[in-house]
Swiss-Prot record:
Coarse class of the protein's main subcellular location: membrane
Membrane topology: Multi-pass membrane protein
Entry's localization field: Cell membrane
Annotated keywords: Cell membrane, Membrane, Transmembrane, Transmembrane helix, Transport
Protein name (record): Uncharacterized protein YrkO
InterPro entries xrefs: Bact_Transport_Assoc, DUF418, HGSNAT_cat
Domain of life: Bacteria
Regions that span the bilayer: 20-40, 62-82, 103-123, 146-166, 205-225, 243-263, 282-302, 321-341, 348-368
The keyword NAD appears for this protein: no
Listed GO CC annotations: plasma membrane
Pfam families: DUF418, HGSNAT_cat
Biological role: Involved in transport.
Native source organism of the sequence: Bacillus subtilis (strain 168)
C-alpha cells in the first residue's frame, strides 16, 4: 500500500518518478562521456598528460568511477521495473529478461568489435544474469547480500596488502585502459578491428573487480525498488534526506584520498593502503551522493525540476546515446579518424565532451518529438518482444509540462 502525503505539497506522480529516473540516467551519461573522452585522449598521448593539470585531477577525483557506477545502480532499478511489468504480461518473465540480456550482449559484442574495446554493455549483460536469482528475494535478503559485498570490498585492499608483504616481488598486472587503448591509438581502423578482441581477452582476465562492483550496484538498485523508495517520493522526504546525509558523509570520507594525493602521503605504504580502501569505494559513495543530491533538489526545490528536465531526453535514449558517444569520440580523437587527441589538452577534451553531449541532447529532443523510443531502444524492444507494444510514435506520457512548475 502506497502511503499518501499529508499536508502541503503535491505527491510525486508516476510521470514525475519516470522523469526523475530519466534525469539521473541522463546526468550519469554526461559523466560517462567526460570520463571516456579523457581516457581516449590520454591513451593517444600515452597517459602523459601533466599530473598537476587541475582539470584532469578534478575529472579523476569527482567523475572517474562514479558515473558508470551510478549507471549500474540504474540498471538494477530498470531490472526490477522490467520484471514487474513482464510478470503481468508473460508466464516466464525470467526467460524474457534473459532474452533481453542476450540481445544487450550482442550489442556489446558489436560495439567492442567495430567501435571501442572500452565497452560496458557486454559486462552489464553478463552480470545481469545474476540478478534473476534475486527478483523474488525479500528486501531484507537483498540488503544482507549488499552488506556482505560492501564488507568484502572494504577488506580486499587488506588482503592485497598481506599478499604484497608475503610476495614482495609480486608482478604488476598491466593496466587495462593503458594497454588496450594505447595499443589502438596508432592503428588503422581495420587493424584496430583485427586486434581489438586480443585486447578484450586481457580485459576479461582482470574483470572480476569490475563485475563485482557492477553487481553490487545492481543489487542496490534492486533494493531501492523493493523498498519502494521511488514510489510517492514526496511522502518519503525524511528517508531521502537520511540517504543524502549518509551518502554525503561517506563520499567525503572516501574523497579524503584527495588529501593523501595532494600531500603525497600515499607514497607511504600505510597511507597507500588507506588510499586504496578509500579509492575502491569512491564509486559507490560518489554515485549515491550524486543520485541522492538530485533527489533532494527534485523534492525540496520543485522549481528546479524544469531546468533538470534537460537530462531526460538523453536519459530516455541512453543506449542510443551511449553507442553514439563512442562512435563520435573514436572518430574525433583516434588517429584512424580526425586524430584530434594529438592537438588538444584537458580543457579541449572537456569542451568536446560537453559539445558532444549537447549534440546528443539536441538529437534526442528532436527524435523524441516524433517517436516514443530511441532508435536503438526500439530495436532492443523489438528483438525482446518480437514486436513493439503500442505506437512507436511520441505520446503524452512523457510530456514535461506537468512538472515544469
Amino acid at each position: 500500500m502506497i502511503v499518501q502525503k499529508e499536508g502541503r505539497g503535491q505527491p510525486v506522480s508516476l510521470r514525475e518518478r519516470v522523469h526523475f529516473l530519466d534525469i539521473v540516467r541522463g546526468f550519469a551519461l554526461l559523466g560517462i562521456i567526460i570520463v571516456n573522452y579523457f581516457l581516449i585522449v590520454d591513451s593517444v598521448k600515452g597517459f602523459e598528460m601533466a599530473s598537476d593539470d587541475v582539470l584532469h585531477k578534478l575529472v579523476s577525483w569527482f567523475a572517474e568511477g562514479k558515473f558508470v557506477t551510478l549507471f549500474s545502480f540504474l540498471f538494477g532499478v530498470g531490472f526490477m521495473i522490467f520484471m514487474d511489468r513482464a510478470a503481468q504480461k508473460v508466464e516466464s518473465p525470467n526467460k524474457l529478461f534473459a532474452r533481453r540480456l542476450s540481445i544487450l550482449l550482442g550489442f556489446g559484442i558489436l560495439h567492442i568489435t567495430f567501435v571501442w574495446v572500452g565497452d560496458i554493455l557486454a559486462f552489464y549483460a553478463v552480470s545481469g544474469f545474476l540478478l534473476l536469482a534475486f527478483y523474488k528475494r525479500t528486501a531484507k535478503t537483498v540488503l544482507r547480500w549488499i552488506i556482505a559485498l560492501i564488507v568484502f570490498q572494504f577488506l580486499t585492499p587488506v588482503f592485497t596488502m598481506l599478499y604484497n608483504v608475503i610476495n614482495t616481488a609480486g608482478s604488476k598486472n598491466p593496466n587495462f585502459s593503458e594497454f588496450t587503448l594505447f595499443s589502438h591509438s596508432s592503428l588503422t581502423y581495420m587493424e584496430s578491428i583485427s586486434t581489438r578482441w586480443t585486447d578484450m581477452v586481457t580485459m576479461a582476465a582482470g574483470s572480476f573487480s569490475m563485475i563485482y562492483s557492477m553487481f553490487l550496484m545492481f543489487l542496490l538498485g534492486v533494493y531501492f525498488v523493493k523498498m519502494e523508495f521511488f514510489k510517492d517520493m514526496e511522502a518519503k522526504k525524511p528517508i531521502w534526506k537520511r540517504i543524502w546525509i549518509i551518502s554525503t558523509i561517506a563520499f567525503l570520507i572516501t574523497q579524503s584520498s584527495i588529501l593523501l594525493d595532494m600531500f603525497n602521503l600515499s607514497e607511504n605504504m600505510l597511507w597507500k593502503d588507506i588510499s586504496s580502501v578509500l579509492g575502491q569505494n569512491g564509486g559507490l559513495t560518489g554515485s549515491m551522493f550524486y543520485m541522492s543530491t538530485f533527489a533532494m533538489l527534485f523534492l525540496y526545490l520543485p522549481q528546479l525540476r524544469g531546468p533538470m528536465m534537460i537530462f531526460t531526453k538523453v536519459g530516455r535514449m541512453s543506449l542510443t546515446c551511449y553507442l553514439l558517444h563512442s562512435i563520435i569520440g573514436t572518430v574525433l580523437f583516434l588517429r584512424y579518424g580526425f586524430g584530434l587527441a594529438d592537438h588538444i589538452q584537458s580543457a579541449g577534451t572537456f569542451m568536446f565532451s560537453l559539445a558532444v553531449y549537447f549534440v546528443l541532447m539536441s538529437f534526442s529532443t528532436l527524435w523524441l518529438k516524433r517517436f516514443r523510443y530511441g532508435p536503438m531502444e526500439l530495436v532492443w524492444r523489438k528483438l525482446t518482444y518480437g514486436k513493439v507494444n503500442g505506437s512507436p510514435k511520441a505520446t503524452p506520457l512523457h510530456s514535461e509540462k506537468s512538472i515544469q512548475k
